[in-house]
A protein has these predicted regions:
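ABC ATPase NBD coupling module
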Residues: 12-31
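Q-loop/switch helix immediately C-terminal to the Walker
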Residues: 36, 41-57
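Conserved ABC ATPase "signature" region
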Residues: 50, 62-77
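Conserved ABC ATPase signature
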Residues: 81-88
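Hydrophobic anchor residue at the start of the ABC signature
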Residues: 95, 99
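ABC-family nucleotide-binding domains
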Residues: 114, 121
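H-loop/switch region of ABC-family ATPase nucleotide-binding domains
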Residues: 145-147
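Long, hydrophobic alpha-helical segments
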Residues: 222, 226, 237-258
């Protein structure tokens, strides 16, 4: 919340607190440690800490980060993937992801920690307490949810919630030693969310494989069906549909980013750190920007058969337009998948059926390709003309994306 008021109510009445303008505000630059790790297993230890600093707006300082990792007993595992770490080491990485960005911030900031000591050994607990005290001395605010008596001793104020939901508060003066923190560094803007998604896909291309394999299977089936179809004008609509079906399938497959965001609540961490509009970025990062282009040309090459060279040249000249719309359709499909995944019952049939709306732009593109095959490309804006059909398909896709991204509340 960036505007409005937060009021305490002890009368047992539930009150909805929200932005006075009805929108979620951008609150960035803070530290966050969830009770679950909030990390993807395909990240390396160093990438995670550096990424947390980048998304908080801190400049790169590889040497300083490696020194911090060494102090926390993670120096020798800096290039290891998080999935290969033990539970205790993963917890250290999650805690550092919250503490380091704030420690490098010269301006007062906030750290939110949920059971940070859970799974830490005694040495790491000591480091945690020392860092908490040092951050507090620098003027940073720290909010900790914990049942650990050791962590409670590091706090200046203790708020206890009883079984009957009554709040009690007391102030104490902690006498724990203060750790030596790294020096703050300058602010710097990064597109870390995009870099994170691209980095994980390069390392483990499950999205490309997950889209490519069904598309190739569909292409083989389309080719089998097309062998008995006469290449004449009365069959152009069927040939157009068979040509576009494989590339359409690449667009509507569930993107791998859904799985990556659901892993250990990584999506919750990124949503909190990225601020408003994160779903829009997720939908863009959840698409394959390259696969539709070669797939649509390959599909036409396989399906075209003995079509005349003149028609073949006309179609080949404008197939990139269909690939462009398919890429946008893939963004809209990813947004719909993300919207459904956020529902309480994400696997419900009603949620899955939302994907059926994507058939409409597919039919518009099929109509456009049929017209190009019959009469060549036309830029008239009348209904039924190729360019008009492609434009309608694109506008439909944009509206579907806006519906999935803008309308639902974060």
């Amino acid at each position: 919340m960036s505007k409005g008021q937060v009021l305490r109510n002890d009368q047992g009445i539930e009150t909805t607190v929200r932005d006075s303008e009805g929108q979620r505000g951008d609150i960035t630059g803070f530290g966050l440690c969830l009770q679950t790790e909030g990390m993807s297993g395909d990240e390396t230890v160093f990438e995670r800490i550096r990424g947390a600093c980048r998304v908080a707006g801190r400049a790169d300082n590889p040497q300083g980060l490696h020194q911090i990792l060494s102090e926390w007993g993670l120096g020798h595992r800096a290039e290891d993937r998080i999935c290969k770490l033990s539970g205790g080491l993963r917890r250290r990485v999650a805690v550092l992801s919250a503490l380091v960005p704030v420690a490098l911030n010269s301006e007062p900031s906030v750290v939110l920690l949920d059971e940070p000591s859970e799974g830490l050994d005694q040495s790491s607990r000591g480091l945690l307490l020392g860092w908490l005290r040092a951050l507090a001395e620098r003027g940073h605010g720290i909010l900790v949810a914990t049942h650990d008596p050791e962590v409670i001793t590091a706090c200046d104020r203790i708020v206890t919630i009883s079984e009957n939901s009554e709040l009690t508060s007391k102030v104490q003066q902690s006498k724990l030693d203060i750790a030596n923190l790294p020096e703050p560094c300058s602010a710097e803007s990064h597109m870390e969310l995009v870099a994170w998604a691209c980095r994980l896909e390069r390392r483990n291309p499950i999205d490309t494989i997950g889209r490519g394999v069904p598309a190739l299977v569909a292409l083989l089936l389309a080719y089998t069906l097309s062998t008995d179809i006469t290449r004449s004008s009365e069959n152009y609509d069927l040939l157009a549909a068979l040509t576009l079906t494989p590339v359409f399938i690449t667009a509507i497959v569930t993107p791998a980013i859904i799985k990556r965001l659901s892993e250990e609540r990584a999506g919750d961490w990124w949503r909190a750190m990225s601020g408003a509009g994160s779903r829009g970025w997720f939908s863009i990062m959840g698409v394959s920007l390259i696969l539709p282009i070669p797939m649509v040309y390959l599909s036409w090459y396989v399906i075209a058969g003995d079509i005349s060279s003149t028609m073949n040249s006309d179609v080949m000249l404008w197939l990139w337009l269909f690939a462009f719309v398919i890429i946008d359709l893939s963004v809209a499909a990813s947004a719909l998948h993300l919207m459904v995944s956020d529902l309480t019952r994400s696997g419900a049939v009603a949620g899955i059926l939302l994907q059926l709306v994507l058939i409409w732009p597919f039919l518009q593109m099929t109509s456009a390709l049929t017209s190009i095959m019959s009469n060549g490309m036309s830029f008239e804006l009348a209904l039924g003309e190729p360019f008009a059909d492609i434009a309608i398909a694109w506008l439909t896709v944009v509206l579907l994306w806006a519906m999935a991204v803008i309308i639902p509340e974060d």
